[in-house]
Amino acid sequence: MSSFVADRIVMDGLTFDDVLLIPAYSEVLPRTVELKTKFSRNIDLNIPFVTAAMDTVTESAMAIAIAREGGIGVIHKNMSIEEQARQVAIVKRAENGMIYDPVTIRRGSTVGEALDMMAEYHIGGIPVVDDDNHLVGIVTNRDLRFELNHDRNVDEVMTSENLVTTHIKTDLAAAANILQENKIEKLPVVDSENHLVGLITYKDITKAKDKPMACKDDKGRLRVAAGVGVTADTLDRMQALVNAGADAIVIDTAHGHSKYVIEKLVEAKKSFPNVDIVVGNVATGAAAKMLVDNGADAVKVGIGPGSICTTRVVAGVGMPQLSAVYDVASALEGTGVPLIADGGLRYSGDVVKALAAGGYSVMIGSLVAGTEESPGDTIIFNGRKFKSYRGMGSLEAMENGSKDRYFQAGTKDVKKLVPEGIAGRVPYKGTLQEVIYQLVGGLRSGMGYCGANTISDLHSAKFVRITNAGVLESHPHDISITSEAPNYSRPE
């Protein structure tokens, strides 16, 4: 006699509230643990946090902030190709050892044009060059601050006499001395024929000292990734993003174990063999292995665990997140390809569990959607400050460009869309730096309890399955909270 349980139920699935990590003998202090990990095959992170490619989570401000903390942000795709490329370029220009392709203005341009460029790129000075890229001067906001005639030629207001420059082999320490001695903030770098080849700024040197753990490329620029879908213009979008300096491309779909996603992955690796391609989302080891066999440099894991996702309810499909992470981690063992645990994280303890189950990094959305740097609208409700937060499968996000993520790109009539997410609001939390500090602190603490000095060590930690009573016991109980902690609020 056939049995539904025996024939069709293949496994039990567990998620964060179903388990706890078992404390182990430890010689590890939380403050000394090593958090360096891999985002993708060729990109390292100094902390295992990735901000989600969502239109209420990651644009340039968020990507800059998380990279400065040591993680990486994925710029969402709900915008034009040109705008997404511009967002990437802003991140790549935000911080540099030396700016290898500085924004310049041509001799003969106007003060108004210089001011527009400064506003667009958020910079305080621009080298002035001739048609052959010879450096002829530099114009800064100090030169323009009291200039009322915006039609005036920049040649008349720029600094050109006794212009301080340096050569390409100057290191940052020597550059800092030159800037200090001459009381200037920007140091143009020129070759033997006075062609402009770069720019070193005092602000960048200061930032490098203030944020030594920042996630940077080999040129000292902040790292950033960008999301794409599976559409007719995917390769065009990728080309623009790569040209803008994107360090990795994330092919972001609701179902990565799909013929169309794999075909796009193969095309992408053929067109951009030197760019890391991250692909998701999946929930099984078989899916992850297929993506890796076709060239994926990292795999994103999570079908339906997010706080704003309704896929499991609408489609009846998914996998409890911890089981999904473990299944994928087991399948990818020995491949050198890391996995990103995406979704379902409510507390720093969930981050520890996701990494212990096999994750190399975690993708966070709701945990940072309430920060100052998120692009969500600020809302005042009942005297409290909130920020808007929505799933990319929500009706509102799908109308703005994320239909292809759910394989509904051809649906023109809004009433015919089938959403797999909702829109809402989350409490305002302050700056990203404050939130990441608490998340990193919780992760360090968890690693200390497990005796894990590295995230790789944490992969060997043991779990205990708990009951609902165990969950209740884990939270504060039998008390009225009178003073909230910065890293805990009661589950709603």
Name each model feature, range by range.
Residues 1-25, 105-106, 167, 227, ...:
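Alpha/beta catalytic cores of nucleotide-metabolism and tRNA/nucleoside-modifying enzymes
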Residues 29-45, 52-54, 83-121, 128-130, ...:
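Bateman/CBS regulatory modules and CBS-like beta-alpha motifs in cytosolic regions of diverse proteins
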Residues 31, 80-89, 147-151, 171, ...:
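Active-site-adjacent beta->alpha loops and helix N-cap segments on the catalytic face
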Residues 44-51, 97-102, 161, 217-227, ...:
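Short beta-strand/loop segments at the ligand-binding rim of alpha/beta enzyme cores
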Residues 61-64, 236-244, 277, 283-301, ...:
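Catalytic cores of alpha/beta
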Residues 68-83, 246-258, 297-315, 345-379:
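Glycine-rich phosphate-binding active-site loops on the catalytic face of alpha/beta enzymes
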Residues 74-78, 104-105, 125-127, 165-167, ...:
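Catalytic beta/alpha-barrel core
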Residues 75-80, 123, 127, 135-150, ...:
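Short beta->alpha transition motifs characteristic of CBS
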